């Protein structure tokens, strides 16, 4: 007799869907930095050199991978990932909004710092690893998670060119500010999704720092 394949729990799907919000806004914002920084002031950009703009984009990439080490310490020892994840999304959302009002390189660097800090606290992956209780489901679950990550990344990268050049461009001014605001809005919506939807299904998962939870077990 064939054993019926068990599906993923609802907590997995709600948490995994959060990845779409985060990656969509990240790739929308990241793709825009280089173009925004090098575009002329007359077209709504900052008029910076290609070198400075490339450094900005590289800094966002680097810090968004380095600062999560700090975030890992936080969720391991001090605050549960269930709380840091929506807070991190809100902080990143504020960062993208800073990009929408930036008129100097300093404003962009402020955006980079806040976005990187927010992503450092975004610890959705470890939570997903804990809502999956069946060992044989772990690999398929993370494969599905990365599929949703790629969906968000693709949509963000695809939309950015259409939005800033066609949808929001007006009278020769490109739509950089509205695009950054959309990235911010997506993160705020993602935080709301996490708080009002994911929390209903997570139960005690991620409420306590992971190290304390492991010690109790």
Spans of model-derived segments:
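Intracellular juxtamembrane helix-capping segments at the cytosolic ends
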Residues: 121-135
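C-terminal ends and interior cores of transmembrane alpha-helices
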Residues: 87-109
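Cytoplasmic membrane-interface "Motif A"-like loop-to-helix N-cap segments
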Residues: 77-89
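Intracellular loop-helix junctions on the cytosolic face of multi-pass helical membrane proteins
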Residues: 1-14, 135-139, 161-217
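Short amphipathic helix-loop junctions that connect adjacent transmembrane helices
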Residues: 31-54, 165
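Central cavity-lining transmembrane alpha-helices of secondary-active solute carriers
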Residues: 55-76, 154-156
